[in-house]
Amino acid sequence: MLLLARPPKAWHRLFQLQPLALLGTPGGKTQHVRYQLFSTPGPADTGRQGQPQGPGLRTRLLVTALVGAGLGGAWLALRAEKERGRQQQRTEALRQAAVGQGDFSLLDHRGRVRCKADFRGQWVLLYFGFTHCPDICPDELEKLVQVVRQLEAEPGLPPVQPLFITVDPERDTVAAMARYVQDFHPRLLGLTGSAEQIAQVSRSYRVYYSAGPKDEDQDYIVDHSIAIYLLSPDGLFTDYYSRARSAEQITDSVRRHMAAFRSVLR
């Protein structure tokens, strides 16, 4: 007999009957046929050749992601450390250049005498220019105050004092400076003085300037260096930014200098 009966619960597993062997008599006549039951794998199946299944695809992807995140974090930390090292070297090199050494005495746009010591304990962004400048000075001052506003919007950062020193003392009187700075930022201070005082502070910061010839209206252009200076709370020249640097780049640099300064004080 080939198959007498199967328990009802086994029928759902039955999907194929396959002959295993034909057993013959010595005379060559077939005596009977045995069959094996094939079924779908059950919960206890362990895979091919009786070996346990390996980790699933989801597990492998998770492990790969964790390893990648760890390597990425290590690379970013190493990059940040190298950047801090380069910045410290740059800061030391700039300070050794002895830029901004000595004091100055100038009048602000309210007529008050100002010296370098007045800004101790504050971060300062400083620009040299003149009020009759047609385009470059307004653009650079607007960029400077944009940096100040961006830093003001970040909680936990100290305020930055913006300064504007004229290189045209002949025309940039206290009243002229007052009219000019009000268009940029309420905390922007305009500083002016005598020709000798302006020459002294300009030499201190290595600022070149030269007044051009006057036209028939007695108007003239002043050729001068274009740079924004950063002074730390200890009054030291810390960095400078050329016209090619964007407000975002300057903001990021000032932020990093602030972090480095705090780490030294700890």
From Swiss-Prot:
Kindly list the places in or outside the cell where this protein is found, as annotated in its UniProt entry: Mitochondrion inner membrane
Its primary localisation, in coarse terms, equals mitochondrion
- Annotated transmembrane regions: 61-78
Cystine connections? 133-137
Query: Which residue ranges does the record assign to the Thioredoxin domain?
Result: 85-259
| A Gene Ontology cellular-component term | mitochondrial inner membrane
Q: How does it sit in the membrane?
A: Single-pass membrane protein
Which residue ranges are assigned to the Mitochondrial matrix compartment in the record's topology? 42-60
Record topology, Mitochondrial intermembrane segments = 79-266
Which SUPFAM superfamilies does the entry link to?
A: Thioredoxin-like
Gene3D superfamilies, per the entry: Glutaredoxin (3.40.30.10)
Q: Give the transit peptide range.
A: 1-41
Which positions are annotated as binding Cu cation? 133, 137, 224
In alphabetical order, the GO MF annotations are: copper chaperone activity; copper ion binding; protein-disulfide reductase activity
Q: Which UniProt keywords apply?
A: Chaperone, Copper, Disulfide bond, Membrane, Metal-binding, Mitochondrion, Mitochondrion inner membrane, Transit peptide, Transmembrane, Transmembrane helix
Gene Ontology terms describing biological process: eye development; in utero embryonic development; intracellular copper ion homeostasis; mitochondrial cytochrome c oxidase assembly; muscle system process; respiratory electron transport chain; response to activity
Can you tell me which family this protein belongs to?
Answer: Belongs to the SCO1/2 family.
The entry describes its oligomerization and partners as: Homodimer. Interacts with COA6. Found in a complex with TMEM177, COX20, COA6, MT-CO2/COX2, COX18 and SCO1. Interacts with TMEM177 in a COX20-dependent manner. Interacts with COX20 in a MT-CO2/COX2- and COX18-dependent manner. Interacts with COX16.
The function of this protein is: Copper metallochaperone essential for the synthesis and maturation of cytochrome c oxidase subunit II (MT-CO2/COX2) by facilitating the incorporation of copper into the Cu(A) site of MT-CO2/COX2. Could also act as a thiol-disulfide oxidoreductase to regulate the redox state of the cysteines in SCO1 during maturation of MT-CO2/COX2.
The identity of this protein, by name, is Protein SCO2 homolog, mitochondrial
The organism encoding this protein is Bos taurus (Bovine)
